């Protein structure tokens, strides 16, 4: 066999081979014998089918198996010559040429190797970090909100008129063209006025009503209403108000602290203020990281951490980005790409820079996660998806199964690891005073052993 291998750089190699047609044909009998042991053909006992008949009936399968066997032998010899093992590979080799000539085949393939990444410039990549420390005014604002959130609703006198932040219990029924419509009726329905639980015009119509009062009012559903059969329609609603409850004001003192910090043995207002300050600090930190610093850190990692990237993985990422882009394209654009191979190739090529950066950052994050022992457990992935489902009104089990079927769980896990690694690097660069605040709020760091 004529075999040539070339190591292009630390992450890429290429092979060129010319195995003979005779070499392929020598494999036919062995493969045909294996098939003959398994197949059953009328008139013959299992294992006694003539090879000539097997070769005729299963010619395509034999040819395919023989070619695959030959390619694997070519790769095995190439790996040996390169001095590499399967553990050194990243992804599968990409067969770029397989052509049959008169007496031989021409085979070419690109081989991706795990890159060598040196992390000695990480500190240079991390931008300076300074999170805003909450002042007394911000702390007091949050305390007032907590006092409101934890306040109980109590009954009001019969003369009270409904106002924003009151809790109402109502019956209602809606009609379109004098006929009730699906989803337009409820009894003993509760809502808090001003929370935008219902359409704004619906809640406005309830303002000023008194307990036991009944009211009719027109309402036009917005043109973009989520229930398409109601969008833009004019309706008439009949409402009966049963009960008005108002929040019982809570004072900002030790008693409030005991309610909010129910699991604390000695909760005081002083402790509550410390917790509020810490929580506001975490919120400020998350906002700064997500809106500014994480992207800046990624740009620095891309620019300053230099190493060879496996071409095969970049090509795979380009394919993925191209396929994902197709889903958001207009039908005429997709049709244009289908009709022109040149346009499709050009469109795919437009994703090269993004694909290269994505692959590079993934390798860097993976290396950092291993070095710092930062990981994400599978149950954390499921918790994240469960939360996503609850926030979007989806069935959690169905969403998780959808991710599993589409092989997307690994991508979610990697995204979570990336987020955790970036936050870890930025946290290390916080001023000492702010690191102390962070430690008080996070006694159990998010850094976990992968597994």
Swiss-Prot record:
UniProt protein name: Trigger factor
Keywords noted in UniProt: Cell cycle, Cell division, Chaperone, Cytoplasm, Isomerase, Rotamase
Gene3D superfamilies: 3.10.50.40, Trigger factor ribosome-binding domain (3.30.70.1050), Trigger factor, C-terminal domain (1.10.3120.10)
Role description: Involved in protein export. Acts as a chaperone by maintaining the newly synthesized protein in an open conformation. Functions as a peptidyl-prolyl cis-trans isomerase.
Family of the protein in this entry: Belongs to the FKBP-type PPIase family. Tig subfamily.
GO molecular function annotations of the record: peptidyl-prolyl cis-trans isomerase activity; protein folding chaperone; ribosome binding
All residue ranges annotated as the PPIase FKBP-type domain in the record: 165-250
GO process terms (BP): 'de novo' cotranslational protein folding; cell division; chaperone-mediated protein folding; protein transport; protein unfolding
PROSITE patterns for the chain: FKBP_PPIASE (PS50059)
UniProt signal peptide: none
NCBIfam families reported for this sequence: tig (TIGR00115)
GO CC entries: cytoplasm
Annotated source species: Helicobacter pylori (strain G27)
Localisation per UniProt entry: Cytoplasm
Notes concerning its domains: Consists of 3 domains; the N-terminus binds the ribosome, the middle domain has PPIase activity, while the C-terminus has intrinsic chaperone activity on its own.
Record field: catalytic activity: [protein]-peptidylproline (omega=180) = [protein]-peptidylproline (omega=0)
EC number: 5.2.1.8
């Amino acid at each position: 066999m004529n075999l040539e291998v070339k190591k292009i750089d630390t992450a890429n190699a290429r092979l060129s081979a010319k195995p003979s047609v005779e070499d392929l044909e020598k494999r036919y009998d062995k493969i045909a014998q294996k098939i003959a042991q398994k197949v059953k053909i009328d008139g013959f006992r299992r294992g006694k089918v003539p090879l000539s008949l097997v070769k005729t009936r299963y010619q395509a399968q034999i040819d395919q198996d023989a070619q695959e066997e030959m390619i694997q032998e070519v790769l095995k010899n190439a790996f040996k010559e390169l001095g590499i093992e399967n553990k050194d590979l990243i992804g599968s080799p990409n067969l770029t040429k397989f052509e049959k000539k008169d007496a031989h085949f021409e085979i070419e393939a690109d081989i991706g190797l795990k890159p060598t990444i040196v992390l000695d410039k990480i500190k240079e990549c991390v931008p300076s970090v300074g999170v805003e420390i909450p002042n007394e005014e911000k702390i007091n604002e949050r305390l007032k909100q907590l006092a409101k959130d934890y306040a109980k609703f109590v009954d009001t006198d019969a003369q009270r008129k409904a106002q924003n932040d009151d809790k109402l219990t109502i019956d209602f029924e809606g009609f379109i063209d004098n006929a009730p419509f699906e989803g337009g009726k409820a009894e003993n329905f509760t809502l808090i006025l001003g929370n935008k639980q219902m359409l704004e015009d619906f809640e406005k119509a309830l303002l000023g009503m008194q307990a036991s009062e009944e009211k009719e009012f027109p309402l036009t559903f917005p043109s973009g209403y989520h229930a398409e059969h109601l969008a833009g329609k004019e309706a008439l609603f009949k409402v009966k108000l049963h009960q008005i409850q108002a929040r019982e004001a809570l004072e900002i003192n030790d008693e409030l602290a005991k309610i909010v910090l129910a699991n604390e043995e000695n909760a005081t207002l002083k402790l509550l203020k410390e917790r509020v300050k810490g929580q506001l600090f975490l919120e400020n930190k998350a906002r700064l990281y997500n809106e500014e610093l994480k992207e800046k850190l990624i740009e620095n990692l891309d620019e300053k951490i230099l190493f060879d990237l496996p071409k095969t993985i970049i090509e795979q990422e380009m394919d993925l980005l191209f396929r994902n882009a197709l889903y958001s394209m207009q039908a005429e654009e997709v049709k244009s790409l289908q009709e022109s191979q040149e346009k499709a190739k050009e469109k795919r090529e437009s994703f090269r820079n993004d694909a290269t950066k994505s692959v590079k950052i993934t390798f860097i994050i993976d290396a950092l996660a291993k070095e710092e022992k930062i990981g994400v457990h599978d149950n954390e992935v499921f918790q994240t998806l469960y939360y996503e489902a609850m926030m979007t009104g989806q069935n959690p089990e169905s969403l998780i199964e959808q991710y599993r079927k589409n092989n997307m769980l690994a991508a979610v896990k990697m995204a979570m690891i990336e987020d955790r690694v970036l936050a870890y690097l930025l946290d290390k660069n916080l001023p000492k005073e702010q690191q102390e605040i962070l430690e008080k709020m996070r006694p159990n760091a998010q850094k976990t052993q992968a597994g």
